Amino acid sequence: MVHRVADCGFANAYVVEERHGILVIDPGSRGAADKIESLVTDGLGKSMEEVMFIAATHFHIDHINGLGRLLSRCPPATKVIFHHRVRDYLDGKRKLTPMRNWLSGCLPVAIASLKYVQGIRDISFGISGIPLPLLNGLCRIGFSRQRVTFIGGDGRWRYGFGFGDWEIIETPGHTEDSISFYNSGSGDLVSGDFILGYESCGKGKVARFYWDREVLMRTFVRIRNEIKAANIYPGHGDAIHSPGNALPGVQPLTL
């Protein structure tokens, strides 16, 4: 079951609860880390010892900056999941990709997300993961690389990772390292910023803030054609639900 963490800052964070353990997706701030712990222990009646994985759908500031704080409260066996491109960011071999449509794509989402910011901890960030010139090479993590699992790079686009029926799906376009999480049995898709939940019709839309428009368009066509997601949990905005499959209703990018 997918649980959205309430009011945890600019980006949505999710706790995925399965019988065998817990997956946390996108702890984007120190406040998000605290609220995730509260949801796990108080809301779900679970132990932080049950957290198997903490994942980032992409290496942007509003999705990664609670990772270290949350990981410090988890058992030594808990792994952090990144796309394989993040290894190059951390090694200084590659910078974060430049982004397009800051005013028309990013600003409206940031403004709409302000209602989820409840305090200073929800905007308590480091400087890592900022896709701006002079800052896009400052990619650091505040924990041991031994805790990290880098996925992808072998030609596949869907990966099992040892968490039941859940798969990681590569969904590049918003960034080159974007990944989503999909469960074909439940029809749940945690999309990161690939799909957003701010469309007034409640059906969602493909992100207008992106690294590569054509790649993003191809990614959406592939996902729409090859999987069915009755429940889409976006990186920003509200969840999108439709019996059977919500993907055909998502507003795509157009040429």
For each of these PLM feature ranges, what is it?
Residues 23-25, 55, 80, 188-190, ...:
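Residue-level marker for buried hydrophobic side chains located in beta-strands
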Residues 35-36, 66, 245-246:
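Residues at alpha-helix caps and immediate loop-helix transition turns in enzyme cores, especially N-
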Residues 39, 66, 70, 216-219, ...:
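A general structural detector for well-ordered alpha-helical segments in enzyme core domains, enriched
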Residues 1-44, 180-197:
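Conserved beta-strand hairpin/beta-sheet module of binuclear metal-dependent hydrolase folds
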Residues 28-31, 139-144, 160-249:
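Metallo-beta-lactamase
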Residues 148-157:
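Short acidic-hydrophobic, aromatic-tinged amphipathic segments that line or gate anion-handling sites
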Residues 31-32, 42-149:
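Active-site HxH/HxHxD metal-binding segment of metal-dependent hydrolases
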Residues 16, 156-163:
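Short acidic-hydrophobic surface loop/beta-edge motif
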